[in-house]
Amino acid sequence: MAEKTFTITAETGIHARPATQLVNKAGQYSSEITLEYKGKAVNLKSIMGVMSLGVGKGAQVTIKAEGSDEAEALKGIEEVIKEGLGE
Protein backbone atom coordinates (compact mmCIF):
# COMPACT_ATOMS: atom_id res chain seq x y z
CA MET A 1 0.00 0.00 0.00
CA ALA A 2 1.17 3.51 -0.82
CA GLU A 3 -0.15 6.62 0.89
CA LYS A 4 0.55 10.31 1.08
CA THR A 5 -0.98 13.29 2.86
CA PHE A 6 -1.65 16.52 0.97
CA THR A 7 -2.82 20.02 1.85
CA ILE A 8 -5.50 21.30 -0.52
CA THR A 9 -4.45 24.73 -1.79
CA ALA A 10 -7.21 25.37 -4.35
CA GLU A 11 -9.20 28.46 -3.28
CA THR A 12 -12.52 26.64 -3.43
CA GLY A 13 -11.32 23.29 -2.08
CA ILE A 14 -12.56 20.13 -3.76
CA HIS A 15 -15.86 21.12 -5.40
CA ALA A 16 -17.29 19.72 -8.67
CA ARG A 17 -14.49 20.57 -11.12
CA PRO A 18 -11.56 19.53 -8.89
CA ALA A 19 -13.42 16.39 -7.81
CA THR A 20 -13.90 15.49 -11.48
CA GLN A 21 -10.17 15.98 -12.12
CA LEU A 22 -9.30 13.62 -9.24
CA VAL A 23 -11.91 11.00 -10.15
CA ASN A 24 -10.84 10.99 -13.82
CA LYS A 25 -7.18 10.56 -12.86
CA ALA A 26 -7.97 7.81 -10.33
CA GLY A 27 -10.01 5.99 -12.99
CA GLN A 28 -6.87 5.56 -15.10
CA TYR A 29 -5.44 3.08 -12.58
CA SER A 30 -6.47 -0.43 -11.55
CA SER A 31 -5.49 0.04 -7.89
CA GLU A 32 -8.05 0.65 -5.15
CA ILE A 33 -7.67 4.34 -4.30
CA THR A 34 -9.22 6.08 -1.31
CA LEU A 35 -9.44 9.67 -0.15
CA GLU A 36 -9.52 10.17 3.62
CA TYR A 37 -10.67 13.37 5.32
CA LYS A 38 -11.71 13.92 8.94
CA GLY A 39 -11.80 10.20 9.66
CA LYS A 40 -13.97 9.31 6.67
CA ALA A 41 -12.66 7.37 3.67
CA VAL A 42 -14.28 7.29 0.23
CA ASN A 43 -13.46 5.66 -3.09
CA LEU A 44 -11.53 8.24 -5.11
CA LYS A 45 -13.14 6.84 -8.27
CA SER A 46 -16.59 7.95 -7.02
CA ILE A 47 -17.54 11.56 -7.76
CA MET A 48 -20.39 11.44 -5.23
CA GLY A 49 -18.11 10.04 -2.55
CA VAL A 50 -15.48 12.71 -3.10
CA MET A 51 -18.05 15.52 -3.17
CA SER A 52 -19.71 14.22 0.02
CA LEU A 53 -16.58 14.98 2.06
CA GLY A 54 -16.84 18.76 1.60
CA VAL A 55 -13.07 19.28 1.53
CA GLY A 56 -12.16 22.97 1.76
CA LYS A 57 -9.03 25.02 1.16
CA GLY A 58 -6.26 24.24 3.64
CA ALA A 59 -7.66 20.79 4.44
CA GLN A 60 -5.30 17.88 5.02
CA VAL A 61 -6.32 14.78 3.05
CA THR A 62 -4.69 11.38 2.77
CA ILE A 63 -4.70 9.42 -0.47
CA LYS A 64 -4.14 5.66 -0.21
CA ALA A 65 -3.59 3.34 -3.15
CA GLU A 66 -3.36 -0.43 -3.10
CA GLY A 67 -2.78 -2.60 -6.14
CA SER A 68 -0.40 -3.41 -8.97
CA ASP A 69 0.01 0.23 -10.06
CA GLU A 70 -0.27 1.91 -6.64
CA ALA A 71 2.97 3.91 -6.94
CA GLU A 72 2.04 5.28 -10.36
CA ALA A 73 -1.49 6.05 -9.17
CA LEU A 74 -0.26 8.03 -6.19
CA LYS A 75 2.21 9.93 -8.37
CA GLY A 76 -0.47 10.78 -10.95
CA ILE A 77 -2.90 12.00 -8.31
CA GLU A 78 -0.16 14.03 -6.65
CA GLU A 79 0.45 15.82 -9.97
CA VAL A 80 -3.24 16.75 -10.25
CA ILE A 81 -3.26 18.11 -6.69
CA LYS A 82 -0.02 20.06 -7.16
CA GLU A 83 -1.34 21.57 -10.41
CA GLY A 84 -4.20 23.12 -8.43
CA LEU A 85 -6.92 20.57 -9.18
CA GLY A 86 -7.75 22.09 -12.55
CA GLU A 87 -8.48 25.52 -11.08
From Swiss-Prot:
Q: Does the keyword Transmembrane apply?
A: no
List the protein's name.
Answer: Phosphocarrier protein HPr
Q: Which InterPro entries match?
A: HPr (IPR050399), HPr-like (IPR000032), HPr-like_sf (IPR035895), PTS_HPr_His_P_site (IPR001020), PTS_HPr_Ser_P_site (IPR002114)
Q: Which domain of life is it from?
A: Bacteria
- Active-site residue numbers: H15
Modified residue annotations for Phosphoserine: S46
Which Gene3D superfamilies does the protein's record reference? HPr-like
Q: Which Pfam families match?
A: PTS-HPr
Q: Quote the subcellular location field of this record.
A: Cytoplasm
User: What GO CC annotations are associated with the protein?
Assistant: cytoplasm
The chain positions of domain HPr read: 1-87
